[in-house]
Amino acid sequence: LELVSSGEKWGRGPAKDIHSSLKAMVDSPAWHLVKALNTLVSEDGNEIAIDGYAKPRPITAEEKKMIADASKVRSEAQAKKQLSVQHWIGDLPWEEANVRLESQPTANIEGLVGGYTGPGGKTVLPHKAVAKMDFRLVPDMKAADVVPAITAHLAKRGFGDIEVNMSGGYDPTQTAASAPLIQAQISVLKRAGVDPVMWPRSAGSYPGFVFTGEPLKLASGHFGLGHGSGAHAPDEYYVIESTNPKIQGYDGAVMSFVEYLYELGK
């Protein structure tokens, strides 16, 4: 999503960039956006506070056990090192942080754009400011409900001029671990000497709903041998040729899909 604050649409503040000394007598669209953003979340920025926003489906006891088992296998210290973080939200213990990762929607600011962002300073009062945001959804939330909820929430608080532009999005997706598709994946991985760690959901997003949602209602899941990490980061990587016999390279990853298709055909 894009949330856009402009002096022209607001009817206050400048319709073009002006000298910052004039802030003494002219409203700021940038500050207007900051104040609007602040209403969307709790004081610490970690809980969504949008009026009428859909609540996530509670995770089941089976899903909680899956998370607990996975948390025992995955190293918390390694995860923090990989992500370059020192604390989880609210200093949650490892298992509870993973429960939150698997069960809670998010309101994330990807970037803020407005005015001068080059080296040094420039005394300017920007006429427009933009917040790039993403809202991760979890079952049973709907992408179509997000923009109307945000728009109504902002209007109720005097921010009806803020544009809420949806550039893309889709519904959440989930497939049960008991599905034949997932069981076929597990069989192939175990034959390759891998004891898979099972999570109820992928923390990231992909348009799996086109398969798992109406009208198809099919299973969908991620699969493949090989190794990569750092998704969407500057140092994202994937192993093409492996020097570790326990890790497949690109060729081994491709062949794992051949084995997978054979397993599905049984």
Task: Walk through the language-model features, giving the residues of each.
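Short, glycine-/Ser/Thr-/acidic-enriched flexible segments
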Residues: 8-10, 114-117, 136-140, 169, ...
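C-terminal catalytic subdomain
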Residues: 114-149
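Short, low-order "capping/linker" segments at domain edges
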Residues: 173-191
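Zn-dependent metallopeptidase/amidohydrolase metal-coordination segment
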Residues: 4-6, 10-13, 33, 103, ...
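A short beta-alpha structural unit
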Residues: 135-138, 163-178, 201-203, 207
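Generic hydrophobic alpha-helical scaffold/packing signal
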Residues: 110, 134, 147, 151, ...
